[in-house]
Amino acid sequence: MLQSKNNWKRNLFIIGALIPPLLVSLGMVIYPIIQTVIQSFQDPETKAWTFANYVYLFTEKVPKAAIWYTFENAVLTVFLSVSISYLLALYMRFSDSKISKLIGNMYLLPRFIPSLVAVYAMCTIVKDSGLIYRLSLLLPETSKLHGFKPGMLYNMKGIQFMNLWFNIPFATMIIVAALSGISESIIESARDIGAGKLRVFFQFILPLSYKDVLIAVTFVFMSNISSFTTPYIIGPNHPQFLGVYLRKLFSNMEYELAAAVSVVIFLFSSASAFVYLYTNMKESAWESRG
């Protein structure tokens, strides 16, 4: 009887502790999302229900180009970031060289540099009158590199470079943690029975780390599909990233269209999260059956 009473008090305390953050979530996250979805289906003049905002986004040239350009950049960033990060993580995990230790101590450094500072620093280096161009002027005029201009501003190349700068350390951190959890005895046992490096990787390392790779993919995609600072400063005027296009709509007080763009960004992010959650749920179901 006394134990039941204590359990009731404990459960009541837990519920009471959860109510404040739940109310904050409802007020600052759930409610704005619902309001945004409702507003995206409203006519700007009459406030009547309509699909015109979404029809405009997926049929007109400017918003359609923004959606495709953003998605293309996000997918390319995910592929390059995760691929490079996985190779870096493998090198740091399975190499005892001084270089791997140096990389292990330094690879998180870009995470401590504010994004705005990093983007402007990059501009001063690669712009047409930047550091690289000025250094190239020191070369003989007969050199092919004399007066070299990287041409990395206001196009996809510059955005991709900065995306890799921001995302490789983050993805590497996640994957390194996953690889560190793989027991050395598993690798040694596989090698003892004659398994080569490729077989060890595909049959042991990759299956034991792919869940964390999916986590990296999910977060890198979500952060880039809604990015604003980098494309706003060094991106082209057309096509624009969805974040930059969203800011333009707000400035023009086209709030219903802006709400529709916000919903599209949210759906892109939700899709990547769903893939990760579905994979984990499927694996959990498989393990429970086993």
Please place each PLM-identified region on the residue numbering.
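C-terminal transmembrane helix and the adjacent membrane-cytosol boundary/short C-terminal tail
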Residues: 33, 176-187, 259-290
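Interhelical loop and adjacent transmembrane-helix boundary motif
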Residues: 5-10, 54-57, 61-62, 225, ...
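Membrane-interfacial helix termini and adjacent extracytoplasmic/periplasmic loops
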Residues: 119-164, 234-238
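Transmembrane alpha-helices
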Residues: 19-26, 109, 165, 172-175, ...
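Transmembrane-helix boundary motif in ABC transporter permease subunits
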Residues: 2-7, 76-108, 120, 124, ...
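Non-cytoplasmic
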Residues: 32-36, 171-174, 212-244
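Amphipathic cytosolic juxtamembrane alpha-helices at the membrane-cytosol interface
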Residues: 7-12, 68, 156-158, 182-215
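Short membrane-interfacial helix/loop motifs at transmembrane-helix boundaries
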Residues: 23-61, 139-140, 232-237, 283-290
